[in-house]
């Protein structure tokens, strides 16, 4: 028997290399023209992907960005935590805009559910932390992942076994309500109301629920191209980020396999999305930081300009993002963790008009020079950035679609990023529209 495999499609993983908000949604939307399926493999509705097509702005929080393409199948993998309420709200918004969603959306039966008590715990916990709060979105993501690890989570497939679901829900609420009332001093969550709401979603979800792992395997074996869409960013990863100022899931490339039910051999090209500057939402160390709306000591005028020109406000929470220079030393950490094949630099146009542009290429920590972001929030917080300065450009990069038409200074800045990172730039995004993109290396045709 021949050991030669059947011809497979080409699969691409899109990963954020910073603290999220890198512009993954636009890039995924662009790449979807070459894919037959898009897969979400982690996170929940705590991160928004903003797409601008023509004069229409769409924010997707849970449903894969590929839903905007009429022939593409969208999968929500087992690594996602799913709020049925948030899902159907998003489906309603998309269907009101004329999109066929439910026939093209497939949900893993093993996906963990976010229920009202997860949201209640999230809010109560942040309130109790006070000034030491992590800065979660308050949508129950972390508590849902906690239940999953503790093996008490209710999953999508449990909705179709009402007796088992009701028993497990009662046990879960006994535990969580005890914590809410006795430790956090908050109101308990009502069992009957929670059960009724959950059961109301069961029949609506059923047509969309399937064995996603098997479906993806079959799609790949038939030669289809799969696109895996990450949420958040590498530096927010629960294991590899600036812990404890991280999200509650693994948002690195390796989890594209575990979070969707495919093997690692299925991940052929890893595209790292990198903003031309850095942003961060919420608490946590940020070595190249210039501006923080809530910190009087971080009010640098260039940082404020980056926030204003880049419209740096959370697409889900509306919170102002902290801004700073591009950190290539942190990017090197992300490249190491994700085995990136290439980079996509986004929002280059936000740097237009700056007299000088800085690139963080390393740090000084306790008298020693480092060329890569260290592990652990305590060490990162003590890092002093080492910068290289570049002359800005007078012309605009906005909407440019060809490399040779970029200002020479912009080209030199981008080439230096490649040199420091040790990886090629595959794409450059010069605006929010799908076609405002410079293609240097096609991920699906590499």
UniProtKB/Swiss-Prot annotation:
Reactions performed catalytically: IMP + L-aspartate + GTP = N(6)-(1,2-dicarboxyethyl)-AMP + GDP + phosphate + 2 H(+)
Binding positions for Mg(2+) per the UniProt entry: 21, 48
Active-site residues, record numbering mapped to chain: 21 (proton acceptor), 49 (proton donor)
GO BP field: 'de novo' AMP biosynthetic process; IMP metabolic process
Residues the entry annotates as binding GTP: 20-26, 48-50, 321, 347-349, 429-431
Residues that, per the record, bind IMP: 21-24, 46-49, 137, 151, 232, 247, 319
GN (gene name): purA
Amino-acid positions noted as binding substrate in the UniProt annotation, renumbered to this chain: 315-321
Protein name: Adenylosuccinate synthetase
Organism phylogeny: Bacteria, Pseudomonadati, Pseudomonadota, Betaproteobacteria, Burkholderiales
GO cellular component: cytoplasm
Species assigned in the record: Polynucleobacter necessarius subsp. necessarius (strain STIR1)
Family statement: Belongs to the adenylosuccinate synthetase family.
